[in-house]
Each structure stands twice: as C-alpha cells, then as structure tokens.
Swiss-Prot record:
Residues 81-163, 218-320, 375-469 form a coiled coil. Its main location: membrane. Two isoforms exist, the full-length translation product PodJL and a C-terminal truncated form PodJS. Both appear during a specific time period of the cell cycle to control different aspects of polar organelle development. It comes from the Bacteria. This is Localization factor PodJL. It is found in: Membrane. Pfam families: PG_binding_1, Sel1. The chain crosses the membrane at residues 642-662. Residues 460-497, 589-611 are annotated as: Disordered. InterPro entries: Peptidoglycan-bd-like, PGBD-like_sf, PGBDSf, Sel1-like, Sel1_AlgK, TPR-like_helical_dom_sf.
Length: 974
C-alpha cells in the first residue's frame, strides 16, 4: 500500500483521513506500515493458544487407584487476550487524530480571520471609491450650480445697460470661477491622496507571499472570495456608471461654450445699441434742427463725446468678456485633463485588483482541489484499515461475548450454590432453635410442675392444720384483738430477693401464727374501728394487670435463680408434658376457685381470718384462712415466678418462630423442617384472650402466632436417604469382590440402586477399570459417578468433573466440570481445590479470576499441597493489595462442608436435574430464549429464559417448568 494509492471506505471523515496520511508521512513510511506498527506490532505478537497449550507441560494424574486419593488434572496455560492491546492502539490513534484536528481547526481559524481582514479591507476600499465618486459628483453639481449662476449673471448683464454694475458682475463672475477652480484643485488633491492610499494598500497586499496564505485556505475562503468578487464587480459597475455620467456632464459643459454665447450676446447688444443710438441721434438731430439752430453744434459735440464714451465702454466690455472666455476654456481644459487622468488611474487600479483577485481565486481553487484529492486518498486507505480492524474487533467481541455467557452461567450456578448453602444453614439453625425451644418448654414445665406440687403440699398441710385445730372459743377478752390489730405489719417480701421456699415449715413453727389461732377472736366492732392501710379489697386474682408480663410490657425480668431452689425437692417427672395453654387454663381455674372459696367461706370464718384475708388480697388467700403476711408473700412469689417463666418461654418461642419465618427466601415458603415444627407446635404457641400481643404495630414475633397456612417451597421431594440394608449390602459386596467372588457385583448393584453413594462410586470405578468381570463402559461409569455425586460423595464429584472436563463417557463440558470441582472443593477435597484454582487461573469453564485462583491455591496449600503453595506464591505478584487481602481472608475463613451438609445438598440436586429441565433447555435454545449448557441442571439463566417464554405465551411467569409450560415445549421437542 503506497501513500498515494486510492482507497475507498465510506463514512470516514476527510479530516481523519488527512491526519492519518500526514502522520504516516512524518514517520517516513506508508499508511499501511504505520497502521500495522500502531495497531498490531505495538506490543508484540502473541503465541498461538493451541501451540502454547501443547508446549506447556501439564499435570494429569488420571490413573485410577484404589485408595481414597482421587486423581487430579493440570490445565494448559491460556494465551492472554489481545483486545486490550488493540483498544490501547485505537486510543492512541484517536488521540493523535484529535490533536491533528485541533491543529487543523486552529489553522482554519487563522485563515478565516485573514480572509475576514481582507474582506474588511476590500469593503473599506469600496467605501473610499464610493466616497471619491460622491465627491466627484458633488464637484460636478457645484460646477453646474456655478455655471447656472454665471449664465444668470450674463443674462442680467445683457438685460441691463452698460455701467458699473456690469463691472461688478464680471468681478463676481471671476470670483466664482476662482472658487470653482479651488474646489477642483481640492477635489483633485483628495482624489490623488485616495488613489495613492489605495495603491499603497494594494502594494502592501501584493508584497507578501500569497502562496503561503493560499495553502491554508479551505472551502469557506472560496465562497467568501466569490462574494467579495461579486460585490467588487457591482461596485466597479456602479463606479463606471458614475464616471460615464460625469463624462457626459463634462461633455455637455464643454459643448456649451458659454464664452461664445456671451460674445454673440454682446455683439447683438452692441448692434442694437448702435441702431438705437443711431435712431435717437437722427431723431434728436431732426428735433434740434427744428427747434434750435445755435445749440446744434453743442449738442453734436456732446453726442460725439457720448459716442466716444460708449465706444470705450464697449471696448472694455469686449475685452473683459474675451478674457473671461479664455479663463473658462482653460479651466475646462484643465478639469478635463485631470478627470481623464483620474479615470485612467482608477481603471488601471481596478484592473490590477481584479487580476490579483482572479489569480488568488485560481490558486485557492487549485490548492483546495489538490487537498480534497489527497484527503480522499488518505481516508480511503484509512477506511480500509479501519474496516479490517473492525472485522477483527467484531470477531474478538463475539468470542468475548461467548466467554461472558459462560461466565454468566458460572455466576448463576455459583449463586444457586450459595443459595443452596444458605438454605441448609437456615434449616440447621431452625432445627437447633426448635430443639432449644422444646428444651426450654420442657424445663419451664418441670419448674411449673415442681412449683405446683409444692403449693399443693403446702395447701394440704395447711388444710390439715385447720382441721386439727380446736374450735375457737367465744370472745372473752377485748384487749387481745386490739393488741393484734396494733401489731406492726411486716413489709411484703419481694419475689426478687427472698427464697420463696425458704420458709417451708413456717405453717407449723411460726409463733405468730400459733398466737393467731389460740387467741380468742375480738368483737366485730373492734375490727370495724381499727384502721389498716391494706384493709381495702383488691381486684380479683389474675386480673388484667397480672398478664402484663405475658403481653411483653414488664420492663424488668426476674433476677432470681430458679434451679437452685427446687433442686432439693427432686419431684417426680410428669407423666405428660403440659402445653403453655394448659398451664394458663389451670392458673385461671385456680384463680376462679380461690375467689369462689373466699366468697363462700368468709361468712363462716372468724373476724380475724376475714380481716387477714382482706389485708392479704393474694391468689391463695381463701384456702384455709391460714395465710400470714410472710406466707402470703411466699405464695405470691411462687405464682409470679411461674408466670414470669411462662411468659419468657412464650415470648422466646414466638420471637424465634417469627424470625425463622422472616428469614426465609420467600414470604410464603418456609424450610420443610421449620414448617413441620411450626405445624406440630402451633397449638402450644397460639395465645388467645388477654395473652395476645397488645403492643402497637404488631411486632415480628406475631408472625409466628398467626394461624395462616404455611405453604412449602415448590420443589420436588428429596430422595430418600440410604437405608442400613443398602449399607450392609455394600459392605458384603465389597468383601466378596475383594475375595474374588463375582456374585458380589450383583450385591453391589443392588446397593447402588438402593441409593448408597459409596456403592455407586465403587460401581463406577469398576466400569471404568473393567475389573472383576465387569466390562469397561465409560458411559456407565460416568452415569454411576453422577448418581454418587448427587448423593454427596466428594470423590464421585471429583471423578465426574474429570469426565466432564475430558469428555469421557459423554459430551465435554468445562462449565459443568468446574461446577463439580467446586462442590468437591467445598467439601475439602484437596485435588479438587487445586484443579478449581487452575480453572480460575486459565479461564476454562469459568470466568478468569486470578484472585479466586489464588484463594483456592492458598486453601489447597494449607491442606498440605506444596505445589499449590508454589502456585499461590507465583500468582500473588499479579494481584493488587486489596484483592490479595480479600482472598487471604476468604481462605482463612474457609471451612469444608460435612457429609450431613453434602447429603442435604444432594437431596435438592435430583429435584433440579431431571429430564423436564433438559427438554426445556433444548427447546428454549432452539427458540432463542436460552444460551447455556444443556445438562438438565437448573440455573438462574434457565429460570429467566423459562419466565420470558411463559410471559410471551401468556402464562404466569413463575420461572419453573409446570405442566402447561412442559406441554407447550413438548410440541417443539416432537
């Protein structure tokens, strides 16, 4: 490709074409060589990926061994992508083109200013020429005016008689002619100065180098020059017309010859005067001859003198008129010569300006045509190179899009995997919380049962004491009740400080109590007069305030310990654990019974017992009438303790249930074990009546107390766990196979069909190696490895990943291989961790991520792999400090999953991988909805594609393969 060869590419800016050619010319090479150096040869050629992959040694540990150490593979190195270098070269080329465009814009701006200055000067010259023409016309008008005045004065001279006035008129005429001559001289001087100035400007413009100025002129200069030429031509035509009119006027003035008219007028005037004077003389002579004879001579002499005077006057007038004629002729001749000289100079100057303008226009046009041709050639070449580069970029962008699609699928699988792990954690935490709630309820029930038994024992003991006591004698002494009434009332015992069962024997050993039963009762009037602060009746037991703790409004929870107080009694375990509702109902029944017994038995009791019951106002004040101040406080503390423990357990259960419901992925879907636990204990947790939550806003714990139906997640039922029979079959089959008994193969198949992952993996290895009478069948080996991997065996996951990566026993799929390597790596398999790191490092099956590769190398190195440690050290230099810190933290926080977690994960895997998903993947790929692997495994991309298809078909966009969606997809499958 030469610098001048034409090339044709549409859509290229001429400026960019010219700039590219100019840069190539400055570099001393052709445009193609320059573009090759800038775009392709800038950072050096990269090696062929396939050759690079063949030259690099790999670690493929693919031999099958019997021990538990699975093989590992080495991934070939991948070449780096060249899109970055091409983009960098294009950026540099764009920057250079923009700089050249800036320089061109600056040059064009300067040329524009120069052209504007030239046009301004041309306009000034035109205005000066118009001013000169106007001055010429003014001078001609003044000349015409003066000529009219001279003609008028000559007419007056002719009409008037000869005398002093004629001389004055001639002098005035001479003065006017002098003024006219002065005006003409001044006009000539101004014209000369204007012409000299115009010549100087033209010389100044022509003295510069016009070729240097013309080279920088662009298309707009031609248009403006054409406009200037048009205006100049119009001005020249107007100036020519003005000069032509001036010439006509000067010709008229010249042909008029005012001196000839004056001479003829004077001659006719003289002849007329002569005739008149002759006639007058003859008449006067006749009259004189008639009238006088002596005086005739004197009159004749007088007339002779008069004739002489008249003749002298005529001679002077003739001489003056002749002089005036000569002056006028000279003035006209001089004016004519000067006007002709000015016209010739103006014509030559205008002709010179027109020639210069034409030459400049021709040069500019030539330069512009040459620049257009050069720019067209440069842009054609640049367009060809850009088209080639565009094709390469399109190919690389397509490959990048394909890699991005694979990366998106990988991300979707990772998201699904993370979601699966989160669900497992939620299930574990929910199960733990359910167990804790159950244990808490059991402890609460035991405490309540112990408290109830102790209360019953105390009540029965008090009842026995009341029955054994003698009947009270009639009142004999009045001072005794007064002394009893004036006894100071002890303060009520606080349930948070005293041990509520520390005075268990106070009913029989209390001295105050014995005095109370032995003392005779006082008259009723004494009790009516005595004033006690606590004598007013209180509200019935278990009123609305007593349930404030259950409502969650008690600001301070009990601080006393329960277990140490009840540990000494060791009550028997209840035959059946009571629910929270049963406890509440029994407490209500006890309160109602206490109130009823207090109302009925109060009349039959003594006044002292009645007064004591009124003063106490406690829950158990009506049982036997034996309660003192201290025993009342003990019993109240027991009931309060039971209620507080019950309320705390209920609130804890409600809060945990609400939290579990709110932490699920879907508002209507709960984990299966949580849903079962809630359904099994819904009767125990539900609270009605006063125990319902009365706080505004309905806290989150209320969610667990609602009676709404819990809808489980729409997933298929997980596979049943392997039974002990399958495990026993597997152990028996292994013993027989290792001893050489081929009947163990059938037992192994039965165990594998029973869903035992270890048996499935063992059978897969037998099909792979062809041992013990089993033929080599890689397809069967792959199938059984997949079943074992779905069952949660990490070795099977690693083996299945190798099958997918190498394409043994089925199609090759690096993305699926990376997924199974990831699952095995999560379970702590070192070789899978190493292989997964290699996949992330090379970008096979997953998006290339050096930080993730470094993390898995570090994890494998911590597990004892020295090669992984070396790889991690080599890869550390390629990471930023922040990425390295993040990867190190992730590696330190890594904990391998247990077999229980794997089993839980594998139970959800068969639900996602089924034939229906495979059909959906194939059909949606044909219809253009889905682009990804057709492995029958659910992914976010597949769910989005299914939702889009359902939306287009007018179905609910659930994202799952329901019956209607499967029927419509099956039409395309058939």
């Amino acid at each position: 490709m030469t610098a001048a060869s034409p090339w044709s590419v549409k859509g290229i800016d001429p400026k960019a074409r010219e700039v590219a050619k100019d840069l190539a010319r400055r570099s001393g090479m052709t445009l193609g060589e320059w573009l090759n150096r800038m775009i392709i040869e800038g950072d050096g050629q990269t090696a062929d990926p396939r050759l690079a992959g063949d030259d690099v040694p790999n670690r493929a540990y693919l031999e099958i061994v019997k021990d538990d150490a699975p093989p590992r593979i080495e991934i070939a190195e991948h070449p780096a992508d060249e899109v970055g270098r091409v983009a960098l070269a294009l950026d540099r080329l764009t920057q250079r083109i923009e700089a050249a465009e800036g320089r061109n814009a600056a040059a064009i701006t300067g040329i524009d200013h120069s052209v504007r200055d030239a046009l301004t000067r041309l306009g000034a010259s035109e205005r000066e020429q118009i001013a000169v023409a106007a001055r010429f016309e003014g001078a001609v008008d003044e000349l015409k005016t003066e000529q009219a005045r001279a003609t008028e004065r000559l007419r007056r001279i002719e009409s008037e008689a000869a005398g002093p006035r004629s001389a004055e008129a001639l002098r005035a005429l001479e003065g006017a002619l002098g003024k006219v001559a002065g005006h003409l001289y001044e006009g000539e001087a101004r014209t000369r100065e204007a012409i000299a100035t115009l010549e100087a400007k033209l010389n100044q413009q022509s003295s510069g180098d016009p070729s240097a100025l013309v080279e920088a002129v662009v298309a707009r200069l031609g248009e403006r020059l054409e406009a200037a030429e048009t205006r100049t031509s119009d001005a020249l035509r107007e100036l020519g017309a003005s000069f032509q009119a001036l010439d006509q006027r000067l010709g008229a003035v010249e042909t008029a010859n005012p001196a000839t008219g004056v001479q003829e007028g004077l001659d006719s005037l003289a002849a007329t005067l002569t005739q008149k004077m002759e006639a007058a003389r003859l008449e006067m002579a006749a009259k004189l001859r008639e009238s006088a004879d002596g005086r005739f001579d004197r009159m004749e002499r007088k007339l002779g003198e008069m004739a002489a005077h008249v003749q002298a006057a005529e001679q002077r007038s003739a001489q003056a008129i002749e002089r005036m004629g000569r002056e006028i002729v000279g003035v006209a001749d001089a004016f004519n010569r000067r006007v002709h000289a000015a016209e010739s100079r103006n014509a030559s100057a205008i002709e010179q300006v027109g020639g210069e303008v034409a030459r400049i226009a021709a040069s500019v046009e030539h330069k512009l045509n040459r620049a257009d041709s050069v720019q067209a050639q440069a842009l054609e070449k640049l367009g060809g190179e850009i088209a080639r580069i565009t094709e390469k970029l399109a190919e690389r962008i397509g490959s990048a899009e394909r890699r991005n699609a694979l990366a998106i699928d990988d991300v979707g699988e990772q998201v699904a995997r993370v979601t699966e792990r989160l669900n497992q954690r939620h299930e574990r935490s929910s199960q733990e919380l359910v167990d804790r709630i159950r244990q808490s309820e059991e402890r609460t029930l035991r405490m309540l049962e112990e408290a109830r038994e102790k209360i019953d024992s105390r009540l029965s003991e008090a009842q026995r004491k009341l029955e054994a006591a003698p009947p009270s004698p009639p009142p004999a002494q009045a001072p005794a009740p007064v002394a009893t009434a004036q006894r100071p009332v002890p303060p009520a015992a606080s349930p948070f400080e005293d041990n509520y069962f520390s005075q268990a024997a106070s009913f029989s050993t209390s001295e105050d109590e014995a005095d109370a039963f032995d003392a005779p009762p006082a008259p009723a009037r004494s009790f009516e007069v005595a004033e006690f602060p606590a004598a007013e009746p209180e509200e019935p037991a278990f009123a609305h305030d007593d349930y404030a703790i259950a409502d969650g409004f008690e600001p301070e929870s009990p601080r006393y310990e329960v277990e140490p107080e009840v540990s000494d009694f060791a009550p028997a375990e209840p035959s059946r654990p009571m629910s929270t509702r049963d406890i509440i109902e029994q407490a209500r029944a006890a309160a109602r019974a206490a109130a009823a017994s207090e109302g009925k038995g109060g009349k039959a009791k003594s006044a002292k017992k009645e007064k004591a019951s009124k003063a106490s106002g406690s829950l158990f004040s009506g049982f036997g009438g034996f309660s003192t101040k201290k025993s009342k406080a003990r019993l109240g503390a027991t009931v309060t303790t039971a209620l507080v423990v019950f309320a705390a357990a209920g609130a804890l259960g409600a809060g945990v249930g609400g939290l579990l419901l709110l932490n699920t992925d879907d508002g209507n879907n709960s984990p299966s074990r949580v849903a079962q636990a809630i359904a099994g204990r819904k009767a125990d947790v539900e609270v009605n009546g006063p125990e319902a939550d009365t706080t505004p806003g309905a806290p989150r714990a209320a969610v667990a107390l609602t009676t709404g139906k819990v809808v489980p997640a729409e997933v298929e039922a997980p596979a049943a766990p392997p039974t002990n029979e399958a495990k026993a079959l597997f152990e028996d089959a292994v013993r027989k196979i290792e001893s050489g008994d081929r009947s163990g193969v059938e037992l192994l198949k039965r165990a594998a069909n029973g869903g035992y992952p270890a048996a499935q993996f063992y059978l897969s290895k037998m099909y792979e190696g062809g041992k013990n009478g089993v033929k080599v069948d890689m397809a069967e080996a792959r199938r059984w490895s997949e079943r074992a991997a779905n069952g949660g065996d990490p070795r099977a996951m690693h083996n299945l990943a190798l099958y997918y990566f190498k394409g043994e026993g089925g199609p090759r799929n690096s993305t699926t291989a990376a997924s199974w390597f990831r699952k095995a790596a999560d379970m702590g398999l070192v070789d899978s961790q190493f292989n997964l790191a290699q996949l992330y490092e090379s970008g096979l099956g997953v998006s290339q991520n050096p930080a993730e590769a470094y993390k898995w190398y570090v994890i494998a190195g911590r597990a004892g792999d020295s090669t992984a440690r070396g790889r991690a050290t080599a890869l550390r230099s390629q990471l930023t400090a922040e990425a390295q810190q993040t990867a190190d933290r992730s590696a330190l926080a890594f904990r391998p999953q247990t077999q229980v977690q794997t089993a839980s994960l594998s139970s959800a895997a068969p639900a996602a991988a089924n034939a229906n998903l495979g059909v959906a993947q194939r059909v949606l790929s044909q219809l253009g909805y889905y682009q990804g692997p057709r492995d029958g495994v659910s992914s976010p991309a597949l769910r989005m594609a299914i939702a889009a298809y359902q939306r287009d078909q007018g179905l609910p966009p659930t994202g799952s393969v329901d019956a209607e969606t499967l029927n419509r997809l099956s039409v395309y499958a058939r």
